[in-house]
Amino acid sequence: FFKALLFLGAGSVIIAMHHNENMWDMGGLRKRMPVTYATFLVGSLALAGIVPFAGFWSKDEVLYEALIHGLGTEGSLGTVFLAAYAMGLLAVLFTGFYTFRMVALTFHGEPRTDLAADPESVGWNVKGPLSVLGLLAATTGFLNLAPVKKLTGAKVDFLHQWLEGPEGAALMATLSAKHYKHLLHDVNPAHVTASELGPLLPAALSLGLAVTGALVAFRLYATPEPTEHTAKLGGLQDVLYNNYYQDEYQVWLATNVVQPLAGVADTVDQSLVDGVVDGVSSVSLSSG
C-alpha cells in the first residue's frame, strides 16, 4: 500500500507543480497541499520502517530472521546471513535518510520558486485514493503481527496461517526439503533461538537507525536554505547532483565502444561471412 501511496503522492505533487519534478524547486507544500502531505508522510513513515506503520512489520521480520539464522548457522552460510543482516541495517539507515530528505525538500521549509508558492489545486479524484491508501498504510501492518507473537506469545499470526492455508506449512516444508536441502543442511537455529534473543532488541536497533536517518535528513534539508550545506561539498556536489555521471558514461560507452564494435562486427559479417556464403553459392551454381 505505501509504495503505491508514494507513487500517487508524487504524481499529486507533480500535477500541483505543473509537471516540474525537481524537488529543489519545491518547498513549503505542506501548507498548500495538506491532504497530499499527510498521506505522503504516512507512506514515508511506512517506507522508512517506523513503527507502527505497515513497512515496519515486514522489514523487521526480514531482518530478525536474517539475524536468527546468521547466529544459528555454522560456517560460511552463517556469515552470509549476518552480512545480509548488516546490509539490511545499512539500508534501513539510508532509507530513512533519503525518504525524509524527499519529504523535507518537497513539503517543508519555504517555497523556493513561484510555482511552489502558488501550486495548482489537486482534486479529490487524486486526494480520495491517497486517503484510502494512507489509511491502509497506517493500519494494515497490524495484520502481520508475527513479531508481536514472538514477543508476547499471543496467537495473532492469523495472516500467516491464512496465506499458507490448511496444508501450507506441510507444503512449504516439503518444498524446502526438496529444493534447499543442500543449502540449509548446516542451519541450526537451535544455537540461538528466538526465545533467547527476542525480537525487541533487533527491532529497536533497526527502528533507531531509521529514526536517525530521518532526523539527520530533517536537520539538513528542512530549512529555508537547504543548499547551504551542500555547497560545502565542492566538486563532490557536482558528482552527486549528476548521479555519478552515469548517463554521460553510458552515452560515452555506447558511442565510443559499442558502436565501433558493432560497425566492425557488421563489416566482418557482410564482407567475410556473407562473402564466403555467397562465394560458395556462386561456385555451386557455376559448376552445375
Residue ranges and their predicted role:
Residues 1-23:
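Alpha-helical multi-pass transmembrane bundles of energy-transducing inner-membrane proteins
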Residues 7-10, 19, 59-60, 96-100, ...:
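Alpha-helical transmembrane segments of polytopic integral membrane proteins
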Residues 14-17, 46-56, 88-112, 137-151, ...:
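Transmembrane-helix bundle segments that line or gate the permeation/cavity pathway
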Residues 15-53, 78-91, 114-140, 235-240:
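Interfacial and helix-entry/exit segments of alpha-helical transmembrane bundles
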Residues 29-78, 108, 153-170:
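Flexible glycine/proline-rich, aromatic-decorated loop/lid segments
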Residues 44-48, 88, 92, 133-140, ...:
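Hydrophobic core segments of alpha-helical transmembrane domains in multi-pass membrane transport
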